[in-house]
């Protein structure tokens, strides 16, 4: 009997009982005590007989309900027991298959969450097919296409390389991957439209995964250049998969108009995420593949540039660290080199918004060569952009990080060699005020690198052509260096630069030298006057204290 039936019966009993005179109809009824009280029905008030009968009705109903539930549970338990016995009997007849399935499941389930795949791989039940599928070279020609597809399907099985389990299956998969790469190298028209989805599925199942992250102590000092990269443990499989996918991308059999349905924007976003891998071998393959895709799939070019720009935005404004910035900049250097003239506003915005702000990143040392090359490519395409690049670098100048200052000076010299006189004239004052500060920098590498600017003939020519404005800025810093700098090499370079300036315009040099001496004397007098005033204030304070 259900709870609803019990409630209905209770309501019916209540209605019937209210119409009876319990004192006459049930004269010998004795109630059980309620709430710890004792006595007969009269002890509990006028409603005690009704409550007693209701309790008896509820007790009987509850007992029936309990018996019904027990009976039904017993029947269900018997059914489950018989079913489990039947299942055990059937599994016992195929114990070998279940054991293989457990082993295959273990093979495809990573022990560490960092090695889990971002794309769903094929079920592990196909791992036993590595040994059962015949060799491609042994199959009849008419069956090789289906066999090729079957081998790609079984190669979508992913193994966990964080342990030594399934060594035979791992080696069998590696041999199968090598076999399909060999088949692609020796077979014409092997990438037809029907197989493209299988290719993308197999490649994605293997390479798209959650990248390993290194847990670093935030308080521990470490130099990124000294850190050993964390190599991918699954590289014996990944390398062959990347090699296979590279063959697919560069194959003449692959029509980009058809393949773009499979190598789509979602695929490209996942591919770009892999550039953050710590393994330089993987990033090198990714760089080659992405460059080939950009060259072949023209419909994806604009999207790829925007996606790379988004990666740079995350590096600049969020993480400040990314392992693949250098490789992405290397690809961009080739892309910028192919820009048509005049440059589109889209390409200029990419420079201003995404490339130049990369100078702010703390890890600049890991990719500054590629970034400097991109800057040079833009200036070669449009010399007017030199003003934007140099003034932005001066705005982002790393005042307190001397190692980054040296990198900035290297890039400044390379950019100045490509700068035209009109752009140089616009920024010469702010530029050489910064260089004057660098000349007098106590860090000898910064001072030395700045003085090396006079070894570049084109920069010397630009300086001499604007010497009326620049000599007064530079000569004072050079004289200060010659008297105060501690490094002997910097002293030698300083005297060489002074000699070059004197030979370029002796009259102007003497005039600037005289002005510098007058400024020093005036500064000395101001310093003496300042010291005298402080002395007077000190004496006034002492007199007030004594009083």
Spans of model-derived segments:
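Intrinsically disordered, low-complexity basic segments at termini and long loops, enriched
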Residues: 1-56
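Eukaryotic acidic, Ser/Thr-rich intrinsically disordered low-complexity regions
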Residues: 57-58, 64-66, 437-438, 472-547
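Alpha-helical solenoid scaffolds in large eukaryotic transport, assembly, and signaling factors
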Residues: 57-391, 395-399, 404-406, 414-427, ...
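Intrinsically disordered cytosolic tails
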Residues: 101-141, 145, 444, 451, ...
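Intrinsically disordered, low-complexity regions enriched in proline, serine, glycine
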Residues: 193, 215-216, 284, 405-406, ...
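Generic hydrophobic alpha-helical scaffold/packing signal
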Residues: 394, 409, 413-416, 432-439, ...
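Short, contiguous acidic/charged loop-to-helix segments that flank catalytic cores in large enzymes
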Residues: 399-400, 421-424, 437-442, 462-468, ...
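Alpha-helical bundle/repeat cores within regulatory domains of eukaryotic proteins
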Residues: 439, 443-476, 489-497
